[in-house]
Structure formats: C-alpha cells, structure tokens
A protein has these predicted regions:
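DPxDG-like acidic metal-binding loop motif
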Residues: 82-93, 97-118
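Catalytic-loop motifs flanking and including active-site residues across diverse enzymes
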Residues: 17, 21, 103, 218-222
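N-terminal subdomain of lithium-sensitive/metallo-dependent phosphomonoesterases centered on the IMPase/IPPase/PAP
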Residues: 1-88, 147-150, 154, 195-196, ...
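Flexible glycine-/small-residue-enriched beta->alpha junction loops
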Residues: 112-136, 140
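Short basic, glycine-rich beta-strand/loop surfaces that mediate nucleic-acid
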Residues: 77-78, 107-110, 207-211
Length: 317
C-alpha cells in the first residue's frame, strides 16, 4: 500500500487522538498549572496513539527517554500491526497559554512513513517560513529579515508596508523586530506557540506573510510537516547554546551542526498533520462545553493532494 494511502487510513484515528488530548488539557484552562495541563494532554494522546493500527515510533516528543516517562523520543506506540510510522508531536503546544486561559493553545501530532521526519534534538532552531504561492527561493535564512521582507513584497507586487511578519515575543528577537520595522513592515508578536506562527503563514485570513525567529527544533519539524502539506517554504538551522546540546545532536545522528535545512529535509516524505484547538485561536476554535456536550475543531492536512480539512466533532460530555 502507498505511503499516502497508509496515512489516509490513519487520519480519523489521528484526529480522535488529538481531540482526546485537547479535551483533557481543556479541563485545566486558566487554572495556572501548565505542568498538569501538559500531563493531561500527554496521557490522553498516548492512549489514543496506542489504539492506532500502526508500528509507530516517536521521533519528536516530550524529550529523551531519561527525561520523559511518556511519549519520549524512541518510544514505540500503536498496536504493533500496520505500517511503520514516525511521529512528531506536541501534546499541548502552549502550556502557558492554557494555564493563563490565553488563545492559540493546540494539541498537535504529525505522521510520516519511517524515516520521513528529521530526527531533531531538543535544542533551539532558527527558522523562516512562508506560505504557498510564492517563487521558490523567495526566502533565505542567511539574508536579513528586512531583505526577506523586501523579497516577499516584490514577489507579491506590494509595498513592504503591506507585509506582516509573525515573531515570537522574546528578548532575543528585539533585533529581528527592529530590522523588520525599519523597512515599514508590520510585526505580529506571539506570546507562545511557534507551530501556530508558522502555520499562520499558510492561511490568508490571518494576514501573516512570513514567520521568522528562533524557537524549539522539535516545533520546527512539526511546523514543517504542515507546510509540506500545503506547499509552503521553510528554512531552518539548529542553534546550540552549549556542548551538551551539540552532543545531543550528535547522538541523533546529525553530523553537520551548521547545516541549513530546507522544507524537504525537515519533512522528506508524505505527511499527515493534525491540530485540535484547546483554546480559541487563529487556526481553530478551542474546546467548548454546552448543554451536556463537548465540541472540538481540528485542522487536518495531508501532503498527498495538498488536502486541508476542518473537522468539527460533538460528543456527550
């Protein structure tokens, strides 16, 4: 059976697993305990993944085996029957957002055939991304943010003042923000959740033209699977703060520590991307409870055919 067909057969079960994680985390929205919210999502997602007919392996997860008791890198999930699948996940993207009752918290999981996702260490990653419909090579991580803004504006036939760039709100990004604004472009700051930021470039209604900045490498691979599904562009480079992080990268098999990865190296084969809203956000609505029922909204993307679906599910509370 083809890779695309295998992933298609897993899609609805993947949605169910992400929904379960989102619902579990939603019980802790606004309660100020991000660790408890994350653990609730982890427990529910792991249960859902283990019910799926696949030989699954976590390649992007909650950390190394000695750091995370569940959904650790290398953990095998699924029933043990079916296709060999690599999985990247973030059971609760936006733990702080959830704890504070803020927007854009998601339960996120991606699937690809074995070997189809970059085995990225849990370090930082410099990233730049745009959505579909732009000339190949329009962005370059080695150019300044302002030069990339100019290139995008030129490709779209608009002024740089019409370009909006999404950046995580971090002190380390102050120079990036200043450079973007120096050419008149607008900056939308995200308090947390750079998977959401990257994916926003693919959805016209968000008004986001480009994402740039430094965030987690695992989140970079997750976001890359979504972009691959819809034809966006992305470049990334691992960023190491110390020798321990370099050693961690070597352990995952990365040889060239300065390599600039393009989208097809981050996610090299057919992909399935699933994100269920925990709190209301730009991509999907959050979990809602009303009149004895629970409703969820899930964004699902498939690289085969560049298919994007929104699935709304209602179940008894």
């Amino acid at each position: 059976m083809s890779d695309a067909r295998n992933l298609e057969r897993l899609a609805l079960d993947a949605v169910s697993a992400a929904e379960a994680a989102a619902i579990a985390a939603s019980t802790l929205i606004g309660r100020g305990d991000k660790e408890a919210a994350d653990q609730a999502a982890v427990d529910a997602l792991r249960t859902g993944l283990n019910a799926m007919a696949m030989k699954g392996r976590i390649v992007i997860g909650e950390g190394e085996r000695d750091e995370a008791p569940m959904l650790y890198i290398g953990e095998e999930v699924g029933t043990g029957e079916g296709p060999e699948i690599d999985i990247a996940l973030d059971p609760l993207e936006g733990t702080s957002l959830t704890a504070k009752g803020m927007a854009n918290a998601l339960a996120v999981v991606s699937f690809a055939p074995r070997g189809g996702l970059l085995y990225a260490p849990d370090t930082y990653m410099d990233k730049i991304a745009v959505g579909a419909g732009l000339p190949a090579g329009v962005i370059d991580l080695d150019r300044s943010p302002s030069d990339n803004v100019k290139a995008i504006a030129n490709a779209k036939g608009v002024s740089t003042e019409d370009i909006c760039v999404c950046v995580l709100e971090r002190e380390r990004h102050e120079g990036i923000v200043a450079d973007i604004r120096s050419v008149g472009a607008r900056v939308m700051m995200l308090p947390d959740g750079d998977v959401n930021g990257v994916i926003s470039t693919t959805i016209a209604a968000t008004g986001i033209d480009m994402y740039v900045g430094q965030g987690g490498a695992p989140e970079g691979v997750l976001a890359a699977t979504a972009l691959r599904c819809v034809g966006g562009q992305m470049q990334a480079r691992l960023f190491f703060r110390n020798d321990d992080e370099r050693a961690r990268a070597a352990k995952t098999g990365i040889v060239d520590l300065d390599r600039k990865y393009d989208l097809n190296e981050l996610a090299s084969r057919e992909c399935l991307f699933v994100a269920t809203g925990v709190t209301d956000g730009d991509l999907v609505d959050g979990v809602r409870r009303s009149k004895g029922k629970i409703s969820t909204e899930t964004l699902i993307m498939q690289s085969s055919g560049s298919i994007v679906r929104h699935i709304r599910t209602e179940r008894p509370a």
